[in-house]
A protein has these predicted regions:
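Feature marking well-ordered beta-strand scaffolds used for ligand recognition
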Residues: 1-374
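Short boundary segments that mark the start of a structured unit
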Residues: 368-568
Length: 568
């Protein structure tokens, strides 16, 4: 009842951090649309707005964010699919946050689709991975018998089909991806570039791995199956890969309901991409159906329907251990389609989002990463850097009550408005702590000098991953590097390049917009000049100044008086 649209149920969920402000948002699918909720203050979430849609039990949502150098600001769009109703692909403009959201279009490349996915992005920031081009996959749609197919996000306000974009064989229910950079890219993907993009196709009765590095020339790599339950009792539903890209966790939506199993997650090794092989299995304490899951560090966050959220320790991926759960559906733990539909564990704050079919949005604090070997992370979520300096970043081994094991964590830089090899020198690697060592470890990054003195403030990011030996990722596993520079106050422009007015209309209002940043007070002067219409004869002379205060991003108007004369 707290949602403005008064939905009767909820479904899937995704998250978004606005890199202009650092504010965090939940995007939750509802029976009658998609709601965007500000969760920056997790104890006081507030709905920003809802984009309405036709009634459906199934919606899926993903977000793409990128830096627009033309306006000096981050831009973001959400893409929502719907199944069972003809409501197309809903594209949502997130660029008026925190004040509002708006509908860009109902894109008609398909009439409906069960799921949507975006490859080659970081799932916390929803930005492109270094050196890779994101593409959007529509999954389980009314086209191509439901097989997944891809679209370009070069113009993110719409979906542009990629040539030969029909991939797969048979209906794809859900998908995930990973980028392979080790020897498998050469020996198994036969890819000449730096990485191989593997799409994981959950295909109802099997899991298929596809090489989609060239999205117009997709090739099947291998197929994974299992036989502990009859095919008639299987539904290969969804899954996710580990951060080391060696294992996939697979969810079957029917084996609890139809084969009488307790919650069962199967683990496949993909050491050989051409032959995925089951190497482990997690069996839960209840009959609740496992639905969707996501990896963060050595934790697996799983929406477990009537059990709510289940969290597994996957330090040993083949032998997961149940380390926590939060019950969003208290009446029972049966094999029914009630309770937690989706989860999103990637917010920079470390908070976890859960969507429950009957009770809505949950924002949870993660208490499952406590470990005697410590939590590995940054002390803050952001730090400042100067042009031309060598920046030293400390990484902590915190809360280690009995640090008897050697532990490690990997690090990688992600470009933002600051670009690698232009604004900073990219580095990556592994930080190591010997047994009983809790001293900070350091990462050094060379920041390029500003030769002109004209560069704007910029930012890029450091990401931690793959903690070892039961050490976990702390809440601050992402660090924003804010590089000093000139303040970007946005750009000023007319909202339209031209407009038409009747001579007898009397006057016309011309609208100006402040795009991008709203930091600082800005102004623009204007003056009319003659064209085919003459100032003084056809239009009254006008000049002046339009002003915006610090933080003001509202549209402004200039009123121009038209002279109604008798001349042609």
């Amino acid at each position: 009842n707290e949602f403005s649209s008064r939905p009767s149920a909820a479904n899937d969920i995704w998250g978004h951090v606005d890199l202009n402000t650092g504010d965090e948002y939940a995007l939750i699918g509802l029976r009658n649309g998609v709601a965007v909720v500000n969760v920056t203050d997790p104890e006081n979430p507030s709905e920003v707005g809802t984009i309405s849609g036709l009634s459906s039990s199934w919606r899926d949502i993903k977000v793409y964010q990128y830096f627009d150098s033309g306006i000096g600001a981050w831009q973001a769009y959400a893409y929502a699919t719907i199944d069972s109703s003809t409501d197309y692909v809903t594209i949502i403009n997130l660029n008026q946050l925190p004040n509002s959201v708006s509908l860009v279009e109902k894109n008609r490349v398909v009439t409906k689709a069960h799921n949507v996915y975006i490859t080659n992005v970081d799932h916390t920031l929803n930005i492109a991975l270094p050196g890779l081009t994101p593409s959007l996959q529509l999954i389980g749609s009314n086209r191509f018998s439901g097989a997944f197919h891809s679209y370009s996000l070069k113009s993110p306000e719409t979906l542009t089909a990629i040539s030969n974009n029909y991939f797969g064989s048979g209906y794809t229910h859900d998908g995930a991806s990973m980028n392979i950079t080790d020897s498998r890219k050469d020996s198994q993907c036969n890819t000449s570039g730096d990485s191989c993009t593997v799409f994981i196709d959950f295909n109802e009765k099997e899991m298929k791995l596809w090489n989609i590095t060239d999205t117009s020339d997709t090739k099947l790599l291998g197929t994974g199956e299992y036989d502990d339950v009859a095919k008639s009792n299987q539904y290969v539903h969804s899954g996710w890969g580990t951060e080391d890209k060696q294992h996939i966790f697979l969810h079957d939506e029917f084996d609890e309901k139809d084969a009488g199993l307790n919650s069962t997650v199967r683990i496949f090794s993909i050491a050989d991409l051409t032959n995925p092989t089951q190497v482990g299995q997690w069996t839960g304490p209840t009959r609740a159906i496992d639905h969707n899951g996501f990896v963060r560090g050595n934790r697996y966050y799983m929406s477990n329907y009537e059990r709510g959220l289940t969290v597994l320790d996957i330090t040993d991926p083949a032998n997961p251990v149940d380390v926590g759960f939060f019950d969003t559906y208290t009446p029972s733990n049966n094999a029914g389609f009630n309770g937690a539909w989706g989860t999103y564990p990637y917010l920079p704050s470390g908070n976890i989002l859960v969507s429950d079919i009957g009770s809505g949005l949950y924002i949870l604090k993660d208490r499952t990463h406590e470990s005697s070997q410590g939590k590995l992370g940054f002390s803050n979520r952001a730090i400042n850097a100067n042009q031309g300096e060598t920046l030293t970043i400390n990484v902590q081994r915190d809360s280690a009550s009995n640090p008897t094991e050697a532990v490690s964590v990997n690090y990688q830089l992600l470009p933002g408005s600051a670009k690698e090899n232009t604004d900073y020198t990219p580095v990556s690697g592994t930080l190591n702590w010997p047994a009983n060592d809790t001293a900070d470890k350091t990462i050094e990054i060379d920041i390029a000098a500003d030769a002109t003195g004209e560069e704007f403030k910029e930012k890029f990011f450091v990401r931690l991953s793959q903690p070892s030996n039961t050490a976990t990722l702390g809440s601050n596993s992402y660090l924003t590097i804010d590089v000093a520079g000139r303040v970007n106050s946005g750009t000023l422009a007319f909202t339209s390049a031209e407009t038409t007015v009747a001579e007898n209309q009397g006057s016309i209002d011309i609208t100006l917009a402040r795009q991008g940043s709203s930091i600082g007070a800005v102004s623009a002067s204007y003056l009319l000049s003659s064209g085919t219409a003459t100032v003084g004869d056809d239009v009254e002379s006008a000049s002046g100044t339009v002003e915006w205060a610090d933080g003001d991003a509202s549209e402004k108007t200039i009123s121009i008086d038209i002279i109604n004369d008798t001349d042609d």
